[in-house]
Amino acid sequence: GVAGADAPICLYTDLDFPYTTNSIITLLQQLTSAQFDIAAGVKNKNYYKHVPPFRRFISKLLRACTGFVLRLKVADTQCGLKGFNEKGKELFLSTTIDRYLFDLEFIFLASKNKQVTITPVPIELNENVHFSSMRLGILFTEAKNFITIFFKNFK
């Protein structure tokens, strides 16, 4: 995993590699320019055309909460394409959530750290990507994780 990586830049994505090669290249260019420590993929309107309605609702609700409640530098924390340099890696390894919202915790920590720079990178999906439905149990677990992150906001 990331802890064992010795490359100057790390990228990670979803298991099914749903993003275009151009999206990955653009994200990598943001990091190799040495202007940013973290590059976070962000979904556009076309992305949501491929997502089942309930999943779209949950995604947009979380995006609104992260932007409004947590005031993160990148409100779209759940796009599964991100990258970082050594400074970002250190922050990534300090996360404690090991489920879906680990991305949110990572972006939260980056947004609160004045020594770390982060940039959003618009992404595109590959054609023929299919999304699975979300189980209700996952939502309850992740709601607890969101509350944990929310209370870290006051420390």
Language model regions located:
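The conserved acidic donor/metal-binding loop of glycosyltransferases
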Residues: 14-19
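Catalytic donor-sugar/metal-binding loop of nucleotide-sugar-dependent glycosyltransferases
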Residues: 73, 98, 107-126
